[in-house]
């Protein structure tokens, strides 16, 4: 990679400030086996866990729980008030650019799934084993977190 390519493409991205998000890996036990709920992203259709931006009126943990409701219709309870870990990814913005995001992870034990919720019809939901979930997501740090659930 030449100097001009670095200055034009890579350097601005590398120097961009990170943004912070919160995520909620949602899980349940079925037949004595743990399952993780994955959802599709609205823009690319790739498999992810519910996540979003922090909320001024809520703790980060409660914001993660709110995202689980809005994006996946999850009702449940937080199993940690502090993040169990973090993962990084590049968020695709509406203008086509990307921004690095660090995501704090707050697990949610699922009590139920609603059929009517804010983003119903915009995403697919799928229950899978933690191992399968780790295979389906792209972010290496998230893969590790899912395997540790």
Label the predicted regions.
Residues 1-31:
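Acidic, metal-coordinating catalytic segment for phosphate/diphosphate chemistry
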Residues 17-19, 46, 125, 134:
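A residue-level structural signature of the nucleotidyltransferase/glycosyltransferase Rossmann-like core
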Residues 20, 35, 98-106, 124:
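Short beta-strand micro-motifs in enzyme catalytic cores
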Residues 32-75:
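Conserved Nudix-box catalytic region and its N-terminal flanking loop in Nudix hydrolases
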Residues 48, 100, 127:
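Short aromatic/basic micro-patch
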Residues 73-114:
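Active-site segment of metal-dependent pyrophosphate-handling enzymes
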Residues 103-147:
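NUDIX/MutT-family hydrolases
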